[in-house]
Curated annotation (Swiss-Prot):
InterPro entries: GIY-YIG_endonuc, GIY-YIG_endonuc_sf, GIY-YIG_UvrC_Cho, Hlx-hairpin-Hlx_DNA-bd_motif, RuvA_2-like, UVR_dom, UVR_dom_sf, UvrABC_protein_C. It is found in: Cytoplasm. Belongs to the UvrC family. The keyword DNA repair applies. Its main location: cytoplasm. The UvrABC repair system catalyzes the recognition and processing of DNA lesions. UvrC both incises the 5' and 3' sides of the lesion. The N-terminal half is responsible for the 3' incision and the C-terminal half is responsible for the 5' incision. This is UvrABC system protein C. Residues 15-90 form the GIY-YIG domain. It comes from the Archaea. Signal peptide: none annotated. Interacts with UvrB in an incision complex. It comes from Halorubrum lacusprofundi (strain ATCC 49239 / DSM 5036 / JCM 8891 / ACAM 34).
Length: 592
């Protein structure tokens, strides 16, 4: 459209509030709101921004919708932007929450790391490093032996599971511990997450020193690493700045912009304690090539400022969500209508200058600025591998115990975020052969895809958890079925990327490597979780070894951690375990 066409169209528009769209064919280029539709649209006849001139030039028509109020226009604009995803608007792209530690609301509570706590659970966090949180939770279970099983499994046990044998659960399900003692252990775990580091650090330190005195140096080193993680946990944690006298629900928001990409960090506080944290990536339309903004009140030229990003985020995010009691902002949004709308809904909106609230805003701003300038690891991954941008990645892993309870996982990431609705899992043939297991898993996926029996789109990339052997097995499965999909592997030990043309070591801080690690770790977690479910139905082979009763079995698993480690242990190591003599050690080596 040229300037005359824009003016002619504007003359036909009402002077009421509403929403307008610049369209090219069936594509919506831009959605905007206006207090006065005629005046706002007329202002596009002479935009100063080169980018906006380009948008108007591509448009072939302008459509509009009248609303009763400015607030209705604000909400309609937000919903249209989310649905139509116009190129020239700020668009909310993703929403990823951070992990919490939850102690469930159950007569015999369990402890878990989760992003979605059960109703009534006591949640601590959120935390930025899931790995560090899991290390601490493992230390708590090892020391206080809190259960980690589902309530369904807890209610249906008639004998202790392997967690009890390994010393990480006190088996309250079968009465191996009385309720009062278990409650004391739960209370100790709660005290740790409320800031009392010593309830976990002190016993860990004693165990580490005892292991060193007994010349168990490997065990002492492992305990030292765990102790360091525990002692550092609350150092970064004030991650939850808390005030138990505050009974409001509060959202804290800050935005950071780099180029055409913006990131908004959101902290959510309930009753004075942070209970959720998320970061949201947005596409922000930049100013025109001439570097000048638009003076006609048009929002788009300044969309690469934090204030404009906050305006867009607030309307889109809260249009479909429950309002908090208060919203704290790093700066005021560029659009005053947004503040008016929120305050009309009973939300207190402030930009704090000092005190606890200012600290929360600083924390949000720190998170918003995190990883600035490295916003498309998916694109970087495609460039690194020499393939098209792998928007859809599926990750595969296999989990088993000595060839029993063999299962496989198939997880899916879309644009760098987990697509849990597309996760799949499969029981595999029981055998102690990692390569054959991976070949069977990938062949199952490939055959279903080729036959049109899988309701999911084909992925742009397959990621195998493993090294060259697992990658070769996966490629064999693809060749056998004729399914043409790029595939690579990620080896755990040294984080090497294995491709069909060779092994690569990528920089530790490469965002594309971090993406592969997230997919790999999620495939591993999903496989292990399913394996544990299946494993509960399988007797450990130690049950069939003469001379190994429940007490000895428990000591072996507690000492070595798994049946595989028992099998690999030397005779001297085996006889170091109470209850295992030379004859029993020989029998163990023979049977395993």
């Amino acid at each position: 459209m040229d300037a005359d066409a824009v003016r002619e169209r504007a003359a036909d528009l009402p002077t009421e509030p509403g929403v307008y769209q610049f369209r090219a064919g069936e594509t919506t280029l831009y959605v905007g709101k206006a207090v006065n539709l005629r005046n706002r649209v007329r202002s596009y006849a002479d935009p100063r921004s080169g980018r906006i001139r380009g948008m108007v030039g591509r448009a072939d028509r302008i459509e509009f919708a009248v609303t009763d109020t400015e607030t209705q226009a604000l909400l309609l604009e937000a919903n249209l932007i989310k649905r139509l995803r116009p190129r020239y608007n700020v668009r909310l792209k993703d929403d990823k929450s951070y992990p919490l530690v939850a102690i469930t609301d159950h007569p015999v509570p369990r402890i878990e790391v989760t992003r979605d706590p059960e109703e009534g659970a006591v949640a601590y966090g959120p935390f930025t490093s899931k790995g560090r949180v899991e290390t601490v939770v493992k230390a708590i279970r090892d020391e206080y032996r809190l259960r980690g099983c589902s309530d369904h499994k807890y209610a249906n046990r008639d004998r202790p599971c392997l967690d009890y044998e390994m010393g990480i659960c006190s088996a309250p399900c079968t009465g191996e511990i009385d309720p009062e003692s278990y409650a004391e252990d739960v209370a100790a775990a709660r005290r740790f997450f409320e800031g009392e580091t010593g309830v976990l650090a002190d016993p860990l330190r004693r165990r580490m020193e005892a292991a060193a005195e007994n010349a168990e140096f490997e065990r002492a080193a492992n305990l030292r690493d765990r102790l360091e993680a525990v002692e550092a946990f609350h150092g970064e944690g004030g991650e939850a700045v808390s005030d138990h006298s505050d009974d409001r629900t509060v959202d804290v928001l800050a935005a950071a912009v780099e180029g055409d990409t913006a990131r908004v960090a959101r902290l959510h506080s309930e009753r004075g304690q942070l209970v959720d944290r998320s970061r949201h990536r947005l596409d922000a339309a930049a100013v025109g090539d001439d570097g000048e903004g638009d003076e006609d009140g048009f929002a788009d030229p300044d969309a690469n400022t934090p204030a404009a990003v906050l305006s867009a985020f607030l309307t889109q995010y809260y249009a479909e969500r429950e309002f908090p009691d208060a919203i704290l902002l790093a700066e005021r949004p560029s659009d005053p209508d947004v503040i008016d709308w929120l305050e009309a809904e009973g939300v207190s909106v402030r930009v704090p200058g000092a005190g606890r609230e200012a600290k929360l805003v600083e924390l949000a701003l720190k998170n918003a600025r995190k990883r600035g300038g490295r916003e498309d690891p998916v694109g970087a991954l495609g460039e690194r591998l020499g393939i098209d941008r792998p928007a859809r990645i599926e990750g595969f892993d296999v989990s088993h115990a000595q060839g029993t309870a063999v299962v496989g996982s198939d997880v899916c990431f879309v644009d760098g975020s987990a697509e849990t609705s597309d996760y799949r899992r499969k029981k595999l043939t029981d055998r102690n052969d990692d390569y054959a297991n991976m070949r069977e898993l990938v062949r199952w996926r490939a055959e279903r895809a080729v036959a049109g029996e899988d309701d999911r789109p084909d992925p742009d990339l397959l990621l195998i958890d493993g090294g060259g052997g697992q990658l070769g097995a996966a490629r064999d499965a693809l060749a056998e079925t004729g399914w043409d999909v790029p595939v690579v592997a990620l080896a755990k030990a040294e984080e090497l990327v294995v491709t069909p043309t060779g092994t690569r070591r990528w920089p530790d801080d490469a965002p594309e490597l971090h993406l592969l690690q997230r997919v790999r770790d999620e495939a591993h977690r999903f496989a292990v979780s399913y394996h544990q479910t299946v494993r509960d139905e399988v007797k450990t082979v130690l049950d069939d070894v003469p001379g190994v009763g429940p007490q000895t079995r428990r000591r072996l698993l507690r000492r070595f951690g798994s049946v595989e480690s028992v099998r690999d242990a030397s005779l001297d190591d085996l006889t170091d375990v109470d209850g295992v003599g030379d004859a029993t050690a020989d029998t163990l080596r023979e049977r395993l």
